[in-house]
From Swiss-Prot:
Gene3D superfamilies per the UniProt record, alphabetical: Aldolase class I
Provenance organism: Bacillus cereus (strain ZK / E33L)
Subcellular location: Cytoplasm
Gene Ontology terms: cellular component: cytoplasm
GO biological process, one term: isoprenoid biosynthetic process
Listed name of the protein: Isopentenyl-diphosphate delta-isomerase
Entry similarity comment: Belongs to the IPP isomerase type 2 family.
InterPro entries, alphabetized: Aldolase_TIM (IPR013785), FMN-dep_DH (IPR000262), IPdP_isomerase (IPR011179)
PANTHER family linked: ISOPENTENYL-DIPHOSPHATE DELTA-ISOMERASE
Gene giving rise to this polypeptide: fni
Cofactor(s) the protein needs: FMN; NADPH; Mg(2+)
GO molecular function: FMN binding; isopentenyl-diphosphate delta-isomerase activity; magnesium ion binding; NADPH binding; oxidoreductase activity
Record lineage: Bacteria, Bacillati, Bacillota, Bacilli, Bacillales
Length: 349
């Protein structure tokens, strides 16, 4: 019951605290092309995460599950939206269902709604090989997300305090998993050093989960008697984290998430080097406040606007969008300069 109550608290406080939108994309400007030599009708948006083919560079990221009927209903609706738009979808952490079988239905519902969909299972970095296998089997997942959430756990009143051995556990899961493993942050971003460590143990796909979206330090602080306010602005902004990712020069696929709400955010994230983008809090707010049809319509508009932007840039495919010239300025530029990451190749390609 404690875990289920926490799941419901997370939904409530994620909606009430909102998204900070401090993702850094305001520091990214595209170089206008007056002769794009492109046509809206021929733009295609297919992409890949590793060997996993996706019809869209937008997917529904991990949100919930394990909180009884309410979380079952949310996942049911999200799965319907994913089916309607042929989007991939991740579930929230399945540890609740591994600890209490009665909660499994809130995750299994997605496969009932969308039997042929692409779904990602989800567990924390404390998971064992056996738990990872059970989570994948529970929803017949196409991939497994392992989330890193140190700051959330430290801020959570009942959270973990020991983070030793995490990389070694991830390595074991990667070596034994029958599906691709995606390691993700939960809104605090990833540094190039972290990504290099993950690549060294065989991880091939990373969701950078940057600062700028749902702030899980703020969410957990709402549940505390004594707030750890120093964690409320902790992390690496989404745009910065994507560039840190691409600077590793590893053969990794990158997912951009963290405050992404618009087609321009999507286009900038991909142009910086992401293979796809993920939406969570923004979609949840629309679903909870305006209903499922409004969310379906919003995703239609996102795809339309993304194709308009790609047409303007002369990028006929997602791969071409990853090569358009752009200028990095402001705080993002200063951070990257201090970190010794060269940005000139973005503006001169």
């Amino acid at each position: 019951m404690v875990r289920a109550k926490r799941k419901l608290d997370h939904i409530e406080y994620a909606l009430s605290t909102g998204q900070s939108r401090t993702h850094g994309f305001h520091d990214i400007d595209f170089v206008h092309q007056s002769l794009p030599n492109s046509s809206y009708e021929t733009i295609t948006c297919e992409t890949k995460i590793g060997e996993l083919s996706l019809s869209s560079p937008i997917f529904i990221n991990a949100m919930t599950g394990g909180g009884g009927e309410k979380t079952l209903h949310i996942n049911e609706q999200l799965a319907y939206v994913a089916k309607h738009h042929n989007l991939a979808m991740a579930v929230g952490s399945q540890m609740a269902a591994l600890k209490d079988e009665s909660e499994a239905a809130s995750y299994k519902i997605i496969r009932k709604v969308n039997p042929n969909g692409i779904f990602f299972a989800n567990l924390g970095s404390e998971a064992t090989i056996e738990q990872a296998e059970r989570a994948v089997d529970m929803i017949e997942a196409n991939a497994l997300q392992i989330h890193l959430n140190v700051i959330q756990e430290l801020t959570m009143p009942e959270g973990d305090r020991d983070f030793t051995g995490v990389l070694q556990r991830i390595e074991k899961i990667v070596l034994n998993s029958k599906v691709p493993v995606i390691v993700k942050e939960v809104g605090f971003g990833m540094s190039k050093e972290t990504m290099q460590q993950l690549a060294s143990v065989g991880v091939t796909a990373i969701d950078i989960g940057g600062q700028g979206g749902t702030n899980f330090a703020a969410v957990e602080n709402e549940r505390r008697q004594r707030m750890l306010s120093y964690f409320n602005n902790w992390g690496i902004q989404t745009a910065t984290s994507i560039i840190e990712a691409t600077s590793t020069n590893n053969n990794l696929s990158f997912i951009a998430s963290g405050g992404i709400q618009t087609a321009l955010d999507v286009a900038k994230a991909i142009a910086l080097g992401a293979n796809t983008t993920a939406f969570a809090g923004y979609f949840l707010r629309i679903l909870m406040e305006d209903g499922i049809e409004k969310l379906v319509d919003e995703i239609d508009l996102l795809h339309t606007d993304l194709k308009f932007i790609m047409t303007a840039l002369g990028a006929k495919t997602i791969e071409e969008l990853q090569s358009v010239p752009l200028v990095i300025k402001g705080e993002t530029y200063h951070w990257l300069t201090q970190r010794g990451i060269d940005t000139t190749h973005y503006s001169r390609r």
